[in-house]
Regions:
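Ligand-site clamp/hinge motif
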Residues: 223-270
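Detector for C-terminal structural segments
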Residues: 212-216, 312-338, 379-386, 413-534
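Gly/Pro-rich hinge or "lid" segments in bacterial periplasmic/extracellular proteins
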Residues: 81-83, 174-229
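N-terminal lobe/hinge region of extracytoplasmic solute-binding protein
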Residues: 48-100, 131, 201-202
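Aromatic- and charge-enriched surface segment that lines or borders ligand/interaction sites
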Residues: 94-137, 152, 158-163, 298
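Surface-exposed binding/hinge segments that line
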Residues: 108, 141-186, 210-212
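Append "and occasionally in soluble cytosolic enzymes with long acidic Gly/Pro-rich linkers
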Residues: 300-389, 394, 457, 532-533
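A bilobed periplasmic-binding-protein/Venus flytrap-type ligand-binding module shared by bacterial periplasmic
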Residues: 79-80, 220-224, 284-307, 311, ...
């Protein structure tokens, strides 16, 4: 299988604190007229959002502007949250089929849809959008399986693949899959600043009304939106860009805004009480892993790595790192994202077993390890000392260093022999397939390390991952079974510490209805719900 694993590290540094604090609002609709003290009168929703805008180009977009993009643009399909009655919600494609071998995917394109610039959407517009994504998207690698794409008539798009792949999941990606007006694509091809002028060319429920860089984004309901059942809830969404979580909390509790996407986790309960609201939790795609440097003794011995895995106080890490809003990981695949399975074994906190394994491996007196974590990640700063203290109880001294993520990442890639012994990583898949992403990116063998910073190489694991990747589009249950076997190998060989999956945490103000958070779009705030609020 030809898999590209050069995944961009979007937000690995700058956006991480926001992602840890409070998840974006998954969807909202107005509460009863006059309910509470929220200012949602006259069809205006005010929001304090942590999301910055790195680009308004929907093709190049690969960062926190996803919060806005999902309201302006649409993909072929939306991937629904775990537990939904249907796996997908049709968007630009009203239906789709795949051949038995998973090599041909046919999408029936919705008629009567217009782009915000007045152009009509048809199959050719879809083809041009995906070809642009293949060529220059920030997440262009998601289209690696695509060999060719064609419009066989005005309403039919056919994709031909190099190997069986889950194009439904790819087509529902939050990055690299937006359908864009051909007129705007042509204009941006000759002017790379075209979109930065405040132009938008989507089909979504909102248009970009105005943008004050670093300060404010105003979205306006699109009058000709095709989906009458999911028409924009608000006429205007007025968003203040507020990177500081404490400031956002103050704006919310002072009723300067109706909703805040970022509130410090330690204050969640107090904020909910002040707002007469509720705290809601859900799956998120955010997963914490601790790489072992498997090239250097004593971590080249699986028994040593297993011992250290038993010496991690997992629940304490969750309680201290994310205020209890998390669950112990079943490997590096986050809960709710394919191919997550609770059949994958977990290590328990067992210091006696850890000591016995170390002694059996010839290290009864312990040793010293160097651990690094991202200095810009507040959760890591809170939970890493717990790892140090626990390892000390089995005679392992840990020297901890906080570094900017990109600095430690570059060092680990360029000089494995002298890199850290343990590297704490915060990771999430680009789209809703953590088999082709997490399991590949984090632990698949490679000649030159990019993101497999354990440097672990295992031909049997690689074969399972590669095989599963070619089955996901044609036989997902078979792919799942192979991925579970591969994750069992990760447990047994322990090239990393599988710490925890962070949860999405939302404060729901009393005057707003909030649909369930969608872990497939963690950086996107939908102001018109994909599914009705419960």
């Amino acid at each position: 299988m030809d898999v590209t694993r050069t995944r961009s590290l979007r937000l690995a540094a700058a956006g991480v604190a926001a992602a840890l604090s409070i998840a974006a609002l998954a969807a909202c609709s107005p509460g009863p007229a006059g309910a509470g003290d929220a200012k949602t009168d006259a069809g205006v929703l005010t929001v304090a959002a942590s999301a910055a805008v790195t680009t308004w180009d929907p093709v190049a977009s690969f960062s926190t502007e996803a919060l806005y993009m999902g309201n302006i643009y649409e993909p072929l399909l939306w991937k629904n949250a775990e537990g939904s009655s249907q796996e997908f919600t049709p968007a630009i494609a009203k239906s789709w089929t795949t051949s038995d071998d998973g090599l041909t995917w046919t999408f029936d394109i919705r008629k009567g849809v217009t782009f915000h610039d007045g152009e009509k959407l048809d199959a050719d517009a879809v083809v041009k959008s995906i070809q642009a994504a293949q060529e220059r998207a920030g997440a262009s690698f998601i289209w690696t399986p695509l060999e060719s794409i064609e419009a066989t008539d005005d309403a039919t798009v056919v994709m031909h693949l190099k190997y069986s792949a889950p194009m439904d999941l790819v087509a529902a990606s939050t990055y690299g899959a937006w359908i864009v007006s051909p007129k705007a694509l042509a204009a941006s091809a000759s002017d790379d600043k075209y979109f930065e002028k405040g132009v938008d060319a989507g089909t979504g429920p909102y248009t970009l009304d105005s943008y004050d860089p670093g300060s404010k984004v105003v979205l306006k309901a699109y009058d000709d939106y095709w989906n009458e059942d999911e028409a924009p809830t608000y006429g205007i969404v007025d968003i203040s860009i507020t990177p500081d979580a404490v400031t956002a909390q103050q704006m919310l509790t002072a009723k300067e805004v109706d909703f805040a996407t970022t509130v410090p986790l330690e204050n969640i309960d107090d904020v909910a009480a002040q707002m007469d609201g509720k705290v809601r939790t859900a799956n998120s795609p955010f997963n914490y892993v601790g790489y072992f440097n498997t090239l250097r003794p004593p971590l080249d011995d699986p028994k040593v790595r297993q011992a250290l895995s038993y010496a991690v106080p997992y629940q304490d890490l969750i309680d201290v790192g994310v205020q209890g809003y998390g669950t112990q990981a079943h490997g590096p695949v986050p809960k709710g994202i394919f191919p997550y399975s609770e059949d994958v074994p977990q290590y328990s906190y067992d210091l006696d077993k850890a000591e016995a394994l170390l002694a059996g491996a010839g290290h009864p007196d312990g040793f010293t390890l160097k651990l690094t974590y991202a200095s810009e990640n507040p959760a890591e700063a809170r939970f890493v000392p717990l790892i140090k203290d626990s390892f000390a109880k089995i005679g392992v001294n840990v020297e901890v260093t906080a570094e900017l993520f990109n600095q430690q990442w570059e060092k680990a890639k360029s000089d494995p022999a002298n890199a850290q012994d343990i590297f704490i990583v915060y990771y999430w898949p680009t789209y809703s397939d953590a088999g082709s992403d997490n399991l590949n990116s984090l632990f698949h063998s490679s000649e030159k390390p990019f993101f497999n910073l354990s440097y672990w190489k295992n031909a049997d694991y690689d074969a399972l991952i590669d095989k599963a990747g070619t089955l996901t589009g044609s036989d997902r249950s078979a792919a799942q079974a192979d991925y579970v076997k591969a994750m069992g190998m990760l447990y047994d060989q322990a090239p990393g510490l599988y710490l925890f999956d962070a949860q999405a945490v939302t404060v729901v103000p009393n005057a707003l209805k909030i649909a369930p958070f969608n872990e497939n779009y963690p950086f996107t705030t939908f102001f018109a719900p994909i599914e009705p609020a419960a």
